C-alpha cells in the first residue's frame, strides 16, 4: 500500500512542476480522489482562489494554514488504521501468557486426575502452553513489525507532502 502511495506523491510532484500553472494542474486533477496529496492540494487551491483579492502576505498565510490543517487531517485518517496493529502488538503476548497458564493448569489437572506424573500425562498440557505462547509472540512480533513499517512509510509520505507544501507556498 505505502509503496504505491509514496510513488504517487513523487508522480504528483513531477506533474505539478511540469504544469503550466497551479490552476491548470488543479483543473487536471480528478474531482473525487482519495489520494491525500490531491485532497490537500485541492483545498489549498480553493483557498488560494478564494483569497485572490487579498494581499499576498494574507493569502500566503491563509493558504499555509489550510495546508497545515489539511495535512494534519489526512495524516490522522491514515494513522487511525494503526490502532489495530498497536493493540495486537501490545496485547498478543498477554493472550499467549494466558494460554500458557491455561496449558499448565491442564497439566496439573491431568496429574491430579491420574495421580501419575509421567511425561505422557504432563506433555499435552505443556505442549498446549508452549503453542499458545508461540502464537501470542508470533502475532505480537508481526503486528509490531507491520506497525513500524507502516508508521515509517507514513512519516516519509507526509514529510514529502510537507516539503511540497513549503515549496508551493514559496511560489504563490
Description of each model-found segment:
Residues 129-143:
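Hydrophobic alpha-helical transmembrane segments of polytopic membrane proteins
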Residues 103:
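Hydrophobic positions on the alpha1 helix immediately C-terminal to the Walker A/P-loop
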Residues 6-98, 106-118, 145-172:
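Predominantly long cytosolic amphipathic alpha-helical stalk/bundle segments
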Residues 97-100, 140:
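General alpha-helical segment detector with a strong preference for membrane-spanning helices
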Amino acid at each position: 500500500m505505502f509503496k504505491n502511495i509514496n510513488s504517487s506523491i513523487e508522480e504528483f510532484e513531477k506533474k505539478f512542476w511540469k504544469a503550466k500553472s497551479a490552476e491548470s494542474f488543479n483543473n487536471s486533477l480528478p474531482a473525487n480522489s482519495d489520494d491525500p496529496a490531491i485532497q490537500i492540494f485541492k483545498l489549498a487551491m480553493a483557498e488560494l482562489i478564494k483569497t485572490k483579492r487579498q494581499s499576498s502576505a494574507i493569502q500566503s498565510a491563509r493558504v499555509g494554514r489550510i495546508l497545515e490543517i489539511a495535512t494534519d487531517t489526512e495524516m490522522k485518517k491514515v494513522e487511525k488504521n494503526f490502532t489495530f496493529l498497536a493493540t495486537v502488538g501490545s496485547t498478543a503476548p498477554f493472550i499467549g501468557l494466558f494460554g500458557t497458564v491455561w496449558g499448565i493448569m491442564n497439566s496439573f489437572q491431568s496429574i491430579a486426575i491420574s495421580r501419575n506424573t509421567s511425561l505422557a500425562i504432563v506433555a499435552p498440557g505443556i505442549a498446549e502452553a508452549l503453542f499458545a505462547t508461540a502464537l501470542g509472540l508470533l502475532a505480537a512480533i508481526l503486528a509490531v513489525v507491520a506497525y513500524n513499517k507502516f508508521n515509517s512509510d507514513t512519516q516519509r509520505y507526509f514529510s514529502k507532502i510537507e516539503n511540497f507544501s513549503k515549496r508551493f507556498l514559496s511560489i504563490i
